[in-house]
Amino acid sequence: MGMKQLYIFFKSNHISFLVITIFILVSCYGNVRLFSQPVRVGVILPLFEDSEDEAKKQFGTEVLNGIKFSLSEYYQSHGRDVFLDVRDSKKDIETTVNVLTELAGNDSIICVLGPIYSNELAESADIAFMNQLPVISPTATGDDLADTHDYLFQLNPSYDIRGRIMADYLYKELKMRNFAIISEESYGVNFADHFETEVKKLGGNIAAYETYKRDAKNINDIITELHKVILENDLFINPSNMNLKQREKLERSGVRYGLLDSLISQKTNVSIYYLFGRNAKKIIDTLNIKPYQLKSDSVKFIQGYFDVIYIPISNPSEIGMIVPELYSNGLNYFIAGTGDWNNEKALDENKVYMKNLIFESEYYLDENSPQLKELRSRLQKTDYTLDKSFLFGYDSMGLILHLISEGGTTRQLMYNDLLKVSSYDAVKSKITFDRKRVNSELNILTYDHGLKRICTY
């Protein structure tokens, strides 16, 4: 067929040719967003729109502000092809179920951001599954939610993940083996039980596990129990009772002169494990120094049997009750905690009582981050406040909009793309969904004249 005949064929059959072309494109690129079609994102938050109590409205409003600001930034570079359908849960399970059912019935809704609370998310599971609708909670931390219900996603790591991550970090990265747990008895145990299970799975030893009531005024009874464990298992020496030759041996074996001098002047019994670690017995034998166990009434000593004390609190106010008592009883050498320790004011008030502290948290602001600096600059032109609640909304909406821009414009495409999210750089933390659809990234933080991030783990 010559060029003239080919031209006549295409001209006379241009409609058929166009249809065939579109069919081929759709067949080959069915998952690609060929045309900019508007999509809707459902939002379910405790807004208490019919209440005059501003305190009740604050949290949900701040999260919504973050969502709206993230969307406004998206509009600047992508145009207005994404819309919100915002519903008020009133922090009520029945209301949550009703509004989610309504959203699920609208085919233009490709996913739902919210609800906020774990009990609300649990009741959303069947609706999400039956309608194949991704339901993404920015805050829920409960166990057995996303990991046991398809189409649910948790951007906030669960109790299970938090407990396991701290155990993994302490055991694998810091090489700790002997652990004590002091846990608040109703909320803290959600973390502590998973921590205990993971430590044992790794081969570590939970030498003590004690709990306290949320309204406790002190932990004297717990201190007594920890002392019993120490006195039964720890071995001590007292450099003030040694001759010069023995002291020189200690110094040559790696004991710092400043520490040795302090132990001598204060006549302190010190654990050989504190000085030499897990190989202490072997080292102390080569020095021809005999360690001993302390008597039951001994008070003044530095223990080394516990590598770390893991303390899942229920409120930052408990820090001021626990840490000074640990300090007074020589048990403050190394403390590990949960995200509730992420309170700079409480830590600053108790900094004199802490030597080494690490804890996990889903929230950390890196002031050197260009991403954070740019966000602060943009927010100066608005009435919004950059806080934790705002970022729960901003980061979660940012992830959804990122996936939409990459082609996740239907429920199934959004679901598939969410499953692949790995090391997404949100402002307050990274986001990686594990195979159970729960974010498995946490900041490992410490406190040393201010909060500092050690790593993301």
What are these regions (language model features)?
Residues 2-10, 15-457:
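Extracytosolic ligand-binding ectodomains
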